Design a protein with these regions (language model features):
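Conserved N-terminal beta1-alpha1 strand-loop-helix module at the mouth
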Residues: 1-219
Length: 219
């Protein structure tokens, strides 16, 4: 079980995440997002962020050449495509970097139909909550829709995950659909302001999830 903290804008917080064992950090390259990194983290600053934490760039309908230039300049390990990117576009990008394609769900969406055309063109899926725009809503969708689906690719679970969800998540991991869960994605419910994380909340959540995983590994 891995944890991704998205919407990072402060290099010192990324380093702190790495030290506490967070697996992935998300950086939003979508100008309309309140967590857009813009000039907050330059390519030079990003390259100075060392450690084991993987750097994930979040993009929304960015043209291919601009996206690939950003991947190279920021030395990104993965890209998360959160817009209307086609399977052909995803496959083109996936020839050079790991691609996570995001799908925004309501409570009764036919997941198999949504992901079918992306099966061969992406490395992983992400399931997030449907909202008016492309950004996160800070709200959960009903995870039952995942339990009712056959998901044949590893995926991220996102959308309104917050402190206090640890038990619910641990129960989800035990479901058959939990076997394909690559990582959980947290963001706005762990902030003091957009792009600035409440590190104590994150630390407690990470510890609780890691402790539960360690207990399960010894059973």
């Amino acid at each position: 079980m891995r944890i991704k903290v998205c919407g990072m804008t402060l290099p010192e917080q990324v380093l702190a995440l790495d030290e506490m064992g967070v697996d992935l950090a998300g950086f939003i390259f979508y100008p309309k997002s309140p967590r857009y990194i813009g000039h907050k983290i330059s390519p030079e600053k990003m390259r100075q962020i060392k450690g084991r934490i993987a750097k994930v760039g979040v993009f929304v309908n960015m043209p291919y050449d601009e996206l690939m230039k950003t991947v190279e300049e920021y030395r990104l390990d993965m890209v998360q495509l959160h817009g209307d990117e086609s399977p052909v576009f995803c496959e083109k990008v996936s020839n050079y970097v790991t691609v996570v394609k995001a799908f925004r769900l309501s409570d009764n969406d036919p997941i198999e139909w949504m992901v079918k055309s992306y099966h061969d063109s992406t490395d992983m899926y992400m399931f997030d909550t449907l909202g008016a725009g492309y950004g996160g809503t800070g709200k959960k969708f009903d995870w039952t829709v995942l339990k009712k689906s056959v998901i044949d690719k590893i995926y991220f679970l996102s959308g309104g995950i917050e402190p206090g969800d640890e038990e619910k998540l641990n129960e989800f991991f035990k479901e058959p659909v939990g076997k394909k869960l690559f990582a959980i994605d947290i963001n706005s419910r762990f902030e003091v302001s957009a792009g600035v994380k409440d590190m104590e909340k994150v630390r407690k959540f990470v510890k609780a999830m890691k402790d539960e995983q360690a207990k399960k590994d010894t059973e």
